[in-house]
Amino acid sequence: MGARNSVLRGKKADELEKVRLRPGGKKKYRLKHIVWAANELDKFGLAESLLESKEGCQKILRVLDPLVPTGSENLKSLFNTVCVIWCLHAEEKVKDTEEAKKLAQRHLVAETGTAEKMPNTSRPTAPPSGKRGNYPVQQAGGNYVHVPLSPRTLNAWVKLVEEKKFGAEVVPGFQALSEGCTPYDINQMLNCVGDHQAAMQIIREIINEEAADWDSQHPIPGPLPAGQLRDPRGSDIAGTTSTVDEQIQWMYRPQNPVPVGNIYRRWIQIGLQKCVRKYNPTNILDIKQGPKEPFQSYVDRFYKSLRAEQTDPAVKNWMTQTLLIQNANPDCKLVLKGLGMNPTLEEMLTACQGVGGPGQKARLMAEALKEAMGPSPIPFAAAQQRKAIRYWNCGKEGHSARQCRAPRRQGCWKCGKPGHIMANCPERQAGFLGLGPRGKKPRNFPVTQAPQGLIPTAPPADPAAELLERYMQQGRKQREQRERPYKEVTEDLLHLEQRETPHREETEDLLHLNSLFGKDQ
């Protein structure tokens, strides 16, 4: 523990706490990182005391540098921490880990020549594709030697076929696992597949067709001199009539090499692509987004189906620009059309994030519920004509009952008289149905009152109704005349006598009884 505490002291410990773990990050190095690095050095058989000096850190970096490209995350973190400690010992001011890493690597290459002094055994054994010495064929002592496929590679291939079941991922997976393989190795991979024999038969038929085509395009030149290697036939490329040594010689001979491994891989890829179409019959035109499906899930299904399509890149580009937007649901389509012409996939994913999901549905339902529960909008004209609310107690506008300072009104709220309430007010007005007959409830139709000063525009009355009204008036007059006393009748007759002078005497005789008794009365 003492060695760990003595790695950085004083000013160096203060400088360590100023170095950031990541560029632009907030976290910085602490002493606990030094303790962790010392514990990790024990796993590589390195002493903790090497961290106390600049030369010791250089020795650690020489050991760890070749392992960094293929190392784990802990190894890379240890390498970065040692680079920071080396910069502190070298009194190099750095701001973050990346800057310290670049400075330490530059110093190793310039001064110690670490890259040139690395042993060949620590370098990758598999060179890039297309070059000689590709795995599993390696060069040893000037001769090419075949190395069988590892069980891990075969297991990865079998697991890929079982999990994906000849999906679109099988073709690139086969290309990666069969890099640099001979026809013998490729046949081993195909023989490891136990299930899906129908797909294997499809691949065999494709191989036979391609082999026959190869034989027709490359006829036998004729008899060859003794000891000269013959040219491969279609069956030789398929590995049925050729040995591993012949396949290696065809692939790496100085004159006219024939890459039988790559040719056979191409035939297998054609068969796998046909199997992908058979096992995935869904056409890309049928890939449409569901009404509640997230846009990201729809894009994944679309590109998975597009990957299985065996068409030109130009056609795939057209499908991406047109079908991706055309087959989206109405909600996402409305958003995508607002992005303009030819939007990028990142823009589309960002714009449609959350569209069609539960969050958007809940938001739409909340907005609809808010509109339904809220007050209906008042037209502008009605809002202008609407009167202000008047408080019933004081009769003033602009305040409510809680803000009113006037004393509370006593008695009826309608007429203001004491002794009764508004429900029993005798001066109450009729509603829109009017007052009912004889104190009963009003009828079921509104009472309309014609406003004064207006000329009615109704059609003229019925003549029969007018005649009936006239007869009723005459009968009323006759009834009144019958009820009048006799004196009033006499006065009427006297008035009638004064009007008619020629008959005055006759009328007088009728009024007096002289006509009957004469002068005897």
From Swiss-Prot:
Residues 73-77 are annotated as: Interaction with membrane phosphatidylinositol 4,5-bisphosphate. The record marks Y135, P136, M365, A366, A382, A383, G431, F432, F445, P446 as: Cleavage. One of its GO terms (molecular function) is structural molecule activity. Disulfide bonds: none annotated. Signal peptide: none annotated. PANTHER family: ENDOGENOUS RETROVIRUS GROUP K MEMBER 24 GAG POLYPROTEIN-RELATED, IGE-BINDING PROTEIN. This is Gag polyprotein. The lineage of its organism: Viruses, Riboviria, Pararnavirae, Artverviricota, Revtraviricetes. The gene is gag.
